[in-house]
């Protein structure tokens, strides 16, 4: 398979490449409400100030997340799991600066403004100032030096791979191009995952910013990138990333064929960190519709910024769609140099455009090669707010079933995984209460077992739905572990248990001095109040709610490969781990103390803050409402003990207990009436037997005595 390399040989690049954050400005963005009526939906305007000069940012919503977008990560056991609940599709906007012609703005506007302002020859980054109580933001100039790549013209491109035809003036007209789209599956290698901070949410947001910049550049070709999925190799590299870019690309193609199940029009890009690579990537040229060969490898050099790396991704995509590097032979030019397919674009700031050569290459490619896999943009389904997503395994409004994607679906005979509609006469097609025969499970069948013996409860099928009832568990703040810990979201959040799960048997929670060392506010360690992937230093009252600190176990750790941080306090060794490397079953970072952990008398941790335990908003009093025969659950109802029947926990011998929320309809009055009738019938039979038993015994004894009297001894007869 012919390969084309992205060859920016970076011999002089590393002296001064994309040094961000030199000149800082503080601004408070002012949101300008749109006029009512007209085409105001999806539009917003912000005014920011840079160097005392106001700039108006006119933005329009531009969602580039696929309708089925998921983020895949690996937990500490190496198991792959996915999540889509944290990502807001309506946050991404694109627009321009009113005062600057030919400018481009790409921003995420949820929880503050994050992104880039690309003017004619300068770029600015903007992000919220998290420590500010006001809506203050930092604006910084993205520095670059295009002379770093000057004279470095040693890139390789094989022009005979694709017949470009002859460049003539009529090919310059690209107005006939139709809007099209391509889907991208991005994989972030382990080393880049660590280099970007090892935080899943933060890395995901960075990838979003990169794709926003890529789409801004591809607008000139009327091409839009839709991010289909994101895979983070948070545990390890699943292929070797040693060697040159071509070797890695070949391994990626082999791994992709064996392990990835993608739609036919999805491109896979592996992004890896390489401190000083000779090449910044490798791609298969002109293979956009070849499922077996279309892939790319992008290398993230040391100190490069997100803006610079977005050029790498754009060049990779350019090679897929038939573009080649610009050169002097064809007199390539663009309004603002350097052009995107030139090496100097990697270290340039400001708006970037394709050259006349790139436009010709693309026009020629779409006219002469197979591009059916490039979807019509009008038919691309991007994720919208509160929109049902078919294939995510969650049955939402408008769906009859949702058994996951083609690989995950276990009910292929019952549910169409592409339309989320039932097949034929199927009663169900997904869910814990759906049988392989496409029939509903019987009422009272367990569908979700308790994961904690004290704080979580088993749920049952109700016989009318294919899905298990909502999870029921003890009311947050209920005491467990003999009063030494609290229940929180169905788990007994004992500190020692959290340490054991990380470091193995024998581990236990560390002393206050250890927590104070690990989360010292004096050292400005941002380990508390984690919200929207941003953290702040722990206050003195919150040190027990930051990073988890444990004492060293007597034997080897449960996970020897875990990145352990050692702290020494009063001759004791305190253990903690780096964030982003280990996830609990609920998807939360194991490096931090779990919500609900005791941090003082009648106090527990919530979002990195030590707060008072209270039951405000819940009127369930177990002593009164449950008569002391049960505890309150998360719905404010009684979870009754065995032999007590919900909802009020009245005495009912033989009742399994439970609540009215757990789905077990066998506890209804009619069910118990039937059960009582059956028991009564059995009781009368037993009672009658014991009443007549003495008469039966007397009768049998009388018969035995009468038979004894009838026996006469016989004498001996002599002859």
From Swiss-Prot:
Q: One GO molecular-function annotation for this sequence?
A: integrin binding
Stretches assigned to the Cytoplasmic side: 705-719
The record ties this protein, via CDD domains, to: ZnMc_adamalysin_II_like (cd04269)
The record ties this protein, via InterPro entries, to: ADAM_Cys-rich, Disintegrin_dom, Disintegrin_dom_sf, EGF-like_dom, MetalloPept_cat_dom_sf, Peptidase_M12B, Peptidase_M12B_N, Reprolysin_adamalysin
Tissue localization of expression: Expressed specifically in testis.
**Its domain of life?**
Eukaryota
Q: Where does it sit, as one GO cellular component term?
A: membrane
Q: Which residues does the record annotate as propeptide?
A: 20-179
What residue stretches are annotated with the Disintegrin domain?
Answer: 387-476
Query: Any idea where this protein resides?
Result: Membrane
Q: Which GO terms describe its biological process?
A: cell differentiation; proteolysis; spermatogenesis
| Membrane association type | Single-pass type I membrane protein
Q: What residues are glycosylation sites in this protein?
A: 61, 75, 121, 152, 173, 244, 331, 356, 405, 607, 614, 621
Which Pfam family, giving just one, matches this sequence? Reprolysin
Please indicate the ranges of residues that lie on the Extracellular side. 173-683
TM stretches of this protein:
684-704
Which SUPFAM superfamilies does UniProt cross-reference here? Blood coagulation inhibitor (disintegrin), Metalloproteases ('zincins'), catalytic domain
Q: Which residues form the signal peptide?
A: 1-19
Instruction: Tell me the function of this protein.
Output: Sperm surface membrane protein that may be involved in spermatogenesis and fertilization. This is a non catalytic metalloprotease-like protein.
Descriptive protein name: Disintegrin and metalloproteinase domain-containing protein 18
Its source organism is Mus musculus
